[in-house]
Curated annotation (Swiss-Prot):
This is Troponin I, cardiac muscle. The lineage of its organism: Eukaryota, Metazoa, Chordata, Craniata, Vertebrata. It comes from Xenopus laevis. GO terms for cellular component: troponin complex. Heart. Residues 1-67 are annotated as: Disordered. One of its GO terms (biological process) is skeletal muscle contraction.
């Protein structure tokens, strides 16, 4: 009995080892393929046909990144900073003006001066005033020139961008002389007669047409004359004379 049990036990061990080898050697099952990606949603065009339905659809409202109170607070802070900077610039400008006047406009010492010295001082002051007026005039001329140049450049920019509104022009029929006068101004003095260069066409075609019309009119008269009993009589007589 012991031998039989050992044999069966060995057979069971061999079968168990074979099953383990089969389990190890068995290939892994293939992985399932990933599901296909969903196509992107079609962009709906806002045409006139579906505009009403699009407008009635519930729209998803995007939340703003900054709340209204925060935006108002930032605007007030920016206005306060700009106001403080403007006040500081005005104060600096006033201090600079006072310093310049203190350097260039010193108080006059008129005590103890004679009449001739006062006259000389007045002449010197008038000469300085003339120099200052000349400088002021030159500066104003430069400023006006720069302003006109800036306006011209701004107009060119608007022309290039096409933002200016074109006026509604009306078509006007102009002759050659009027057109040349508009282009050249007073320089144009020679009158241009464009009809002088045209070729003269003979009226033979018109005469032929009149002749054809005349012939057609005569034929109609002959038809009217041959109609009726008298016409048949004339036609019979003419055919009889031709037969004889």
């Amino acid at each position: 009995m012991s031998d039989e049990e050992e044999v069966t036990y060995e057979e069971e061990e061999e079968e168990y080892v074979e099953e383990e080898e089969e389990e190890v050697v068995a290939p892994e099952p293939p992985k399932p393929a990933p599901p296909p990606a969903a196509p992107p949603p079609l962009i709906r065009r806002r045409s006139s046909a579906n505009y009403r339905s699009y407008a009635t659809e519930p729209q998803v409202k995007r939340k703003p990144k900054i709340s209204a109170s925060r935006k108002l607070q930032l605007n007030t802070m920016m206005l306060q900073i700009a106001k403080a900077e403007m006040e500081r610039e005005e104060e600096e400008r006033a201090r600079e003006k006072e310093r310049y006047l203190a350097e260039h406009c010193q108080p006059l010492q008129l005590s103890g001066l004679s009449r001739s010295e006062l006259q000389d001082l007045c002449q010197e002051l008038h000469a300085r005033i003339d120099v200052v007026d000349e400088e002021r005039y030159d500066m104003e001329a430069k400023v006006n020139k720069n302003i006109t140049e800036l306006e011209d450049l701004n107009q060119k920019i608007f022309d290039l961008r096409g933002k200016f509104k074109k006026p509604n022009l009306r078509r006007v029929r102009l002759s050659a002389d009027a057109m040349m006068m508009a282009l050249l101004g007073t320089k144009h003095k020679v009158s241009m007669d464009l009809r002088a260069n045209l070729k003269q066409v003979k009226q033979t075609k018109k005469d032929d047409a009149d002749k054809d019309i005349r012939e057609v009119g005569d034929w109609r008269k002959n038809v009217d004359a041959l109609s009726g009993m008298e016409g048949r009589k004339k036609k019979f007589e003419s055919t009889g004379a031709a037969a004889v």
